[in-house]
């Protein structure tokens, strides 16, 4: 099969027709470009001698070709590679009058060639592998056997230097390293003449594949080791050279050093860096020499158990030079596992500047305020005032300020810390991020609008992404955006640290409760119970523990959570009951008491919230709402007051809570007008978009409310669950069902459900 481009076709046609007689033409191109195919195409052209592979002819043979040129009427077309170029060949080429340029296939020619060859291969893949070199496209279309045979012949003809050069290029050697091999200058030209290299000097994938299949592995490894030693001598990068040797069983001091150096180059790929450190140890490097960096890489890759094991070996090794750094890695891993108190102890033992700041965060989070303040006072930067040092120090100060100062002060400090850390966040293994800590402070003070962009920027940095996505999901849940919360929850993935898993379970519990999905809540509660047992309470886990408290009340399992809530209260007491953090626990406690119908307990939480009302608008809002809840529980519903409180809750980001307050007040009032007003308020705050009435295929039209009831009945919810979801009574749901049954002419409940399923399907 031959497929020439249009200019080449025109020239060949002119030669065959005699219009170019006498033709004196050279075709000089690397192997695979189709020189022989062109000569085959010209076979039979009148008065034209065709000479192939002229670069391989002897001087005597070339002299005989040159003598033919003495006859001015004789035609000659010579095909040759650019190398070798003996003097006799140059003399012949110098007497020719033109040159035919052969080009690689473009996409249309590749597609046409494959179609004619009857090979349904992906065109883009073929081009990527072959660089469009026509001969390689043909070989690829012919199958592996033909491909390997052709390359075997070429490699058998290649000299030792050419093969060395090809193997070096396949190994990823850059031009400087290739030059360091000190191969003859002609070697590069000889290799280029094979057609194996692309325009950028890199090996074409199809040629690299052939080398790997045809050259024994021990020879390829030996050449790679030679390159590695040269690169180490010149302090050059070795990652691309070393990476294929992982798992190859190669050992020795040079190899171990190369693996270690490569791991340092792979900090942006922690899983790869961890494998390289492991390979260094297998090659002969002592674990104590690389253990801390290995542990950090493993931790960055999310394997905190292995990170702790490795770091512990370093800490327990008397001859390890970086025991302090090992303790810092262990402290960070423990923080991700939710062991904040133990984490703080390791950070204190480490006693580096960064570790002391991390210890302040851990001590504060575990309720040890005096120790945290003392440690921050004596903390100083050991080295230069870098961005990283400033960011870590500010994070510690911001967390402490969240307990001892105004929330706005703490939030401002943590935001500055997050901004400072952004350009250098990949330089240290963080126990938590300033962005996450700032978002927690923002969520506890009603500043979700500040938390959201802070978290989005943190997600884009690529550090602690699941942590930041889960907090974005929390914001969406509080706003009543179930779809957005679930999307962020899914984006966080399944491979979560214990701390992130706690938040993920808390989100699922919160979403099920807000959807009045009692069956779903019972299912996820099994995980919630496990999370509560496995994860100690700390200051930064009040959000999920608050959700667990309310859900426990809904499921009648408050006793199971009581010891953990007692720990939370003791922790707060150790910090002086800071309003920022205490209010969140009292707010969830209030709702748990409301669900459990414990008015005295609810009153105690409402009183605590009232005492914190002066801390800021958010705290005043939830204190006022708590007072409304107490009145509603007592049967006293002041519609304007409830509506105002509900709208204020919506304004501080507690959209679902605001809608629930209005809805529950509506259900409990005996004033028909007040009920309608509050129900309308609840629907508006919940953000339910109104839709037109749905028409059944039989012509019966359902109202918006009937359609909502129908969807929830078909979904399997009980009348009480539907009432809770729509802020109406179960009796009203029953009334809607009776009306729909009558209008649809259903003779039984089964018929009614079948009709409703059809209507819901049509509507969707």
What are these regions (language model features)?
Residues 36-38, 144-151, 170-175, 183-229, ...:
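Short capping/hinge segments at domain boundaries that bridge a core fold to an adjacent linker or tail
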Residues 691-764:
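Helix-turn-helix DNA-binding segment
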Residues 24, 220-301, 310, 639-661:
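Extended alpha-helical scaffolding segments used for macromolecular assembly and cargo binding
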Residues 94, 102-138, 164, 226, ...:
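Amphipathic alpha-helical segments of the small helical/lid subdomains adjacent to P-loop NTPase cores
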Residues 37, 64-122:
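Alpha-helical sensor/transducer elements of the RecA-like P-loop NTPase core
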Residues 161, 173, 199, 236-239, ...:
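Alpha-solenoid helical repeat architecture
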Residues 281-282, 312-316, 344, 348-352, ...:
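Amphipathic alpha-helical segments of tetratricopeptide repeats
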Residues 112, 119-153, 186, 190, ...:
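Amphipathic alpha-helical "lid/sensor" segments that cap RecA-like P-loop NTPase cores
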């Amino acid at each position: 099969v031959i497929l020439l481009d249009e200019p080449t076709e025109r020239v060949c046609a002119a030669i065959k027709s005699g219009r170019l007689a006498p033709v004196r033409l050279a075709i000089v191109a690397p192997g695979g470009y189709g020189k022989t195919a062109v000569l085959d195409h010209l076979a039979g052209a009148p008065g034209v001698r065709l000479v192939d592979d002229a670069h391989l002819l002897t001087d005597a043979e070339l002299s005989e070709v040159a003598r033919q040129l003495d006859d001015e009427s004789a035609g000659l077309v010579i095909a040759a590679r650019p190398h070798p170029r003996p003097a006799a060949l140059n003399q012949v080429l110098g007497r020719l009058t033109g040159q035919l340029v052969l080009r690689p296939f473009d996409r249309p020619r590749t597609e046409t060639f494959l179609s004619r060859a009857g090979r349904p291969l992906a065109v883009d893949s073929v081009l990527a592998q072959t660089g469009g070199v026509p001969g390689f496209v043909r070989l690829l279309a012919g199958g592996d056997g033909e491909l390997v045979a052709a390359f075997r012949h070429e490699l058998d003809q290649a000299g030792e230097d050419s093969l060395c050069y090809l193997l070096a290029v396949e190994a990823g050697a850059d031009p400087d390293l290739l030059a360091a091999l000190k191969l003859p200058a002609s070697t590069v030209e000889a290799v280029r003449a094979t057609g194996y290299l692309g325009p950028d000097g890199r090996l074409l994938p199809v040629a690299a594949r052939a080398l790997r299949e045809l050259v024994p592995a021990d020879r390829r490894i030996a050449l790679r080791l030679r390159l590695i030693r040269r690169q180490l001598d010149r302090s050059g990068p070795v990652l691309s050279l070393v990476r294929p040797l992982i798992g190859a069983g190669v050992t020795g001091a040079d190899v171990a050093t190369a693996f270690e150096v490569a791991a340092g180059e792979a900090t942006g790929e922690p899983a790869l860096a961890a494998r390289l450190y492991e390979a260094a140890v297998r090659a002969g490097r002592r674990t104590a020499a690389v253990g801390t960096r290995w542990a950090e890489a493993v931790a960055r890759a999310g394997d905190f158990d292995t990170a702790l094991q490795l770091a512990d070996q370093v800490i327990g090794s008397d001859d390890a030079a970086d025991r302090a750094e090992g303790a810092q890695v262990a402290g960070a891993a423990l923080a991700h596992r939710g062991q904040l108190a133990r984490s703080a102890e390791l950070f204190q033992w480490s006693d580096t500047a960064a570790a002391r700041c991390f210890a302040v965060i851990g001590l504060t989070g575990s309720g040890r305020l005096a120790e945290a303040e003392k440690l921050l006072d004596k903390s100083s930067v050991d080295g230069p005032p870098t961005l990283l040092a400033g960011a870590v120090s500010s994070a510690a100060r911001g967390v402490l300020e969240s307990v001892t100062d105004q929330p706005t002060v703490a939030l401002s400090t943590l935001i500055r810390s997050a901004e400072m850390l952004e350009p250098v966040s990949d330089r240290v293994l963080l126990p938590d991020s300033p962005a996450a800590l700032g978002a927690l402070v923002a969520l506890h003070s009603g500043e979700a609008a500040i938390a959201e962009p802070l978290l989005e920027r943190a997600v884009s940095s690529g550090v602690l992404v699941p942590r930041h996505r889960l907090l974005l999901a929390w914001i969406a849940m509080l706003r009543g955006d179930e779809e957005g919360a679930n999307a962020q929850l899914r984006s966080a993935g399944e491979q979560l640290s214990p701390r992130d898993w706690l938040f993920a379970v808390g989100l699922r519990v919160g979403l099920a409760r807000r959807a009045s999905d009692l069956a779903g809540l019972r299912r996820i509660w099994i995980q919630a119970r496990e999370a509560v047992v496995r994860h100690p309470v700390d200051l930064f886990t009040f959000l999920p523990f608050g959700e667990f408290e309310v859900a426990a009340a809904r499921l009648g399992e408050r006793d199971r959570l009581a010891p953990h809530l007692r720990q939370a209260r003791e922790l707060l007491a150790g910090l002086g009951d800071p309003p920022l953090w205490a209010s969140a626990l009292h707010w969830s406690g209030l709702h748990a008491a409301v669900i459990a119908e414990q008015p005295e307990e609810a009153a105690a939480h409402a009183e605590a919230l009232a005492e914190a009302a002066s801390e800021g608008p958010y705290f005043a809002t939830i204190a006022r709402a708590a007072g409304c809840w107490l009145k509603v529980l007592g049967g006293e519903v002041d519609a304007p007051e409830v509506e105002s409180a509900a709208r204020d809750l919506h304004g501080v980001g507690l959209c679902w809570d605001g809608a629930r307050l209005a809805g529950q007040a509506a259900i409990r009032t005996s004033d028909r007008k007040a009920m309608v007003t509050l129900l309308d308020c609840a629907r508006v705050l919940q953000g339910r978009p109104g839709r037109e009435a749905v028409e059944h295929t039989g012509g019966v039209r359902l109202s918006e409310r009937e359609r909502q009831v129908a969807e929830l009945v078909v979904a399997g919810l009980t009348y009480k669950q539907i009432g809770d979801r729509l802020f109406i009574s179960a009796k009203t749901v029953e009334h809607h069902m009776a009306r729909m049954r009558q209008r649809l002419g259903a003779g039984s409940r089964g018929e009614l459900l079948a009709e409703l399923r059809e209507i819901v399907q049509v509507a969707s």
